[in-house]
Design a protein with these regions (language model features):
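Bacterial Sec-dependent N-terminal signal peptides
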Residues: 1-32, 178, 225-233
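Juxtamembrane helix-break-helix junctions at the cytosolic face
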Residues: 126-130
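Extracellular/periplasm-exposed beta-strand and loop segments of Gram-negative cell-envelope proteins
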Residues: 38-60, 87-116, 144-175, 196-226
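Short glycine/proline- and aromatic-enriched beta-strand/turn motifs that initiate or cap beta-hairpins
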Residues: 19-66, 232
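Outer-envelope beta-barrel architecture signal
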Residues: 23-29, 74-78, 115-117, 131-137, ...
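Residues on the lipid-exposed face of transmembrane beta-strands in outer-membrane beta-barrel proteins
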Residues: 31-35, 63-73, 82-84, 119-125, ...
């Protein structure tokens, strides 16, 4: 029994030392996966030239998967990532706002499901770094490349046909986060703030068959709250 206890203690010590060596290495690699919630900052919303002031938003839980490289300099680090992200969001509004003859219970909706590759680069600092435990904060810019052929846009109960929205192919944001690590496992909490309007416009066809831009306007910035769990290789 004493031999087994001693062996277990040695293995635990070796595991901790290995984990610490990984954390103290000049370069680390890792993966993480998590969930996010999109919160749009709506800049302008109108239908048939009528400003929409009453609406409800619905942010569905989205998911992402990330691979990263971290360059360490004592308590400081710089991290680059490549992430595949799927974000879901919809907005619902009473139809009577632009159509007085509609039923009071009628609702119209715009839904988006945007797929994309995200490439952030940020600076981090370890607030606490002791043994196998640590805590850090980080911030930096992020670029998102929209994969339009995998994305989906839906328009329900709106007074136009053939509605098509164009999302900017590249969108930029700032990210702030807090990370907690236990040995090689870590947890990240982050807030992403969109820097600009992600919509390039919505084209639609009216009852006379005329296609035009501006019948529907849905200008917004994209903000994101996210949580992830990762493993440092």
């Amino acid at each position: 029994p004493r031999t087994l206890i001693a062996l277990a203690a040695i293995l635990c010590t070796c595991s901790t030392l290995c984990a610490r060596q990984k954390q103290d290495a000049l370069v680390n690699y890792g993966v993480k996966a998590g969930f996010s919630s999109t919160i749009y900052d709506i800049m302008q919303l109108s239908v048939a030239s009528v400003p929409i002031g009453e609406y409800d938003t619905k942010s569905e839980i989205s998911s992402f998967f990330t691979a990263f490289t971290r360059f360490n300099i004592k308590r400081h680090y710089v991290q680059t990532e490549v992430s595949y992200n799927i974000s879901n969001y919809s907005i619902h509004m009473p139809t009577t706002q632009w159509d007085p003859q509609a039923d009071a219970n009628d609702l119209s909706a715009i839904g988006t499901r945007i797929n994309g590759l995200e490439v952030p680069i940020y600076y981090g600092y370890h607030i606490m770094k002791q043994g196998s435990y640590g805590m850090s904060f980080y911030f930096g810019p992020k670029a998102k490349f929209v994969i339009d052929n995998l994305s989906r846009y839906t328009f329900t109960n709106l007074p136009y046909d053939n509605i098509k929205e164009t999302i900017r192919p590249i969108n930029f944001s700032l990210m702030f986060g807090l990370g907690i690590n236990i040995s090689r496992v870590f947890f990240d909490f982050s807030l992403e703030y969109g820097l600009h309007n992600i919509s390039q416009g919505i084209i639609s066809t009216d009852a006379d068959g005329n296609a035009s831009r501006g019948n529907i306007i849905f200008d917004r910035r994209k903000n994101v709250l996210s949580f992830s769990v990762g493993f440092m290789l």
